[in-house]
Amino acid sequence: MSDMRLIVAGAGGRMGRALTRAISETKGVVLTGALEAPGSELLGQDAGVLAGLPANGVKLSADLWTLSAGADGILDFTVPAATIANVAIAAQRGIVHVIGTTGLSSSDNAVIKSVTDQAIVVKSGNMSLGVNLLAALTRRVAQSLDAGFDIEIVEMHHRAKIDAPSGTALLLGEAAAAGRKVDLDDHSARGRDGVTGARKTGDIGFASLRGGTVTGDHSVIFAGPYERIELAHKAEDRMIFAHGALKAAQWAHGKSPGLYSMMDVLGLAEF
C-alpha cells in the first residue's frame, strides 16, 4: 500500500511545524503539501527547513485547491475562518480532513457537519491518547456520581493562546455533560467574577489560566461533601497532538464519509 499523502495546514505555525516533524518520523505517510495563509511572509519557504529538518522540497503555498490534487488528507490546526474555508475544498476533493482547530463556534460546527455526507472528517479538541482517555474517565465518573458532586474544569496554557476555555476543556466538559445526560450549553459556568451568588447545582464550571510556555494542563475536579476527586493530564510537548493527528488520518483513510472523533479512532467511544 502506498504512503498516505498529507497536507499540513498552517505549516508555518507551531503545530504545523510539529506536524511536519511528526510526518517525517512516521511510516506510511508523506508530506506532499504545506498550506499557509495568503500574504504570509513564509510563502515559498521549504516546510522541512521551517520545521528544523533538512529541506524536503515542499514549499509553503496559499492554494489549497492545487495542493489537494492527488492528496489523501489534510491536517488542520489553524483558526476557525481558515478551517471553514478548508472544509469546503477537502469535501470537494473527498480527502480526509483532520481538524484540531479550537475556538470553533456553533455555526462553524454546523458547517463542518453539513459536509460529512460526502467528506471524512475527524474532529477533536485534543488529539492525544491521554486526554481522550481522561475524557472517557470523566464521562464514567460523572455518570457514577450524583449532583452532590460539583464538577469544575481547570486548564492552563501558554500566554499566546487566543481562545478560552481551551478546546480540550470543552471536550472534557462535553464528556462530563454526557455522563450527567445534560446539555453542556445549558449547564456551563464560565468566567465567574464579582458577587456571583452561590454555585448552581448541576453547573459544570470552567476556569482558564494563561502564562509562560505551558503546553497544556487540564484537571477535572469532582467536589463532593468532605471529599474531592481530581483527574488530570499534563502535556509536555505538542508532538503528542501531532502524532495523534497522524493516527487519526491513517485510521480515517478509506473510511466511509462521516464525522468522527478521537474517541472513535482510539476505540473509546463505548468506554
From Swiss-Prot:
Binding site for NAD(+): G10, A11, G12, G13, R14, M15, E36, G100, T101, T102, S124, G125, N126, M127
The keyword Oxidoreductase is assigned to this record: yes
Pfam families: DapB_C, DapB_N
Residues annotated as catalytic: H157, K161
Catalytic activity: (S)-2,3,4,5-tetrahydrodipicolinate + NAD(+) + H2O = (2S,4S)-4-hydroxy-2,3,4,5-tetrahydrodipicolinate + NADH + H(+); (S)-2,3,4,5-tetrahydrodipicolinate + NADP(+) + H2O = (2S,4S)-4-hydroxy-2,3,4,5-tetrahydrodipicolinate + NADPH + H(+)
Enzyme Commission no: 1.17.1.8
GO biological process: diaminopimelate biosynthetic process; lysine biosynthetic process via diaminopimelate
Chief location of this protein within or outside the cell: cytoplasm
UniProt KW Protease keyword: no
Enzyme class name: oxidoreductase
Gene Ontology cellular component terms for the protein in this record: cytosol
Function of the protein: Catalyzes the conversion of 4-hydroxy-tetrahydrodipicolinate (HTPA) to tetrahydrodipicolinate.
The protein's name in its UniProt record: 4-hydroxy-tetrahydrodipicolinate reductase
Taxonomic lineage from the root: Bacteria, Pseudomonadati, Pseudomonadota, Alphaproteobacteria, Hyphomicrobiales
Gene label: dapB
